[in-house]
């Protein structure tokens, strides 16, 4: 209860005020619930209690203004505050790859050097090689969903995870243990060193 229900691993809202507004003409009000913004209150911060989903931003994400303008025309951008990052996916790809090697990210690549691979995310940017560890095991309901999605013509794939599917020694020489599927990833540290957290990798 201490971690999963009372959220003692998260920063108390009384420590630092965060405000939010939806539009410029609104008065900013204090946030009363962290919701998706879960600040860690422990050694390792949010890196210790994250669930482990390990996505790369897509090429579109890095150049959202340019991509939107090219696809929909400049007129569609009126009133939008879109801006390119100033760095491209291709420039960031080697750093994503390095992180995935250090973290032991598990998954199936969907696009290796422009070649779409079955079982992976067909919409991801091109990567140079496979994930360092295989994807986590499917549960019964994941298999059921995958089969139904396949039959419907969709492209289901297992989310790349910072939860290690098999024993792994990363490039820094750190040994990480395989996930035991205990179910305590979110809002908990991993005592098995199976999650790509600061204390594990």
Describe the predicted segments one by one.
Residues 140-151, 173-201:
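Helical element adjacent to the flavin cofactor pocket in flavoenzyme catalytic cores
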Residues 5-8, 131-138:
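Cofactor-pocket helix-loop regions in the catalytic cores of large enzyme subunits
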Residues 72-133:
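N-terminal leader/propeptide and maturation segments of large enzyme subunits in energy/redox metabolism
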Residues 57, 61, 96-110, 149-156:
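A generic secondary-structure signal for well-formed alpha-helical elements
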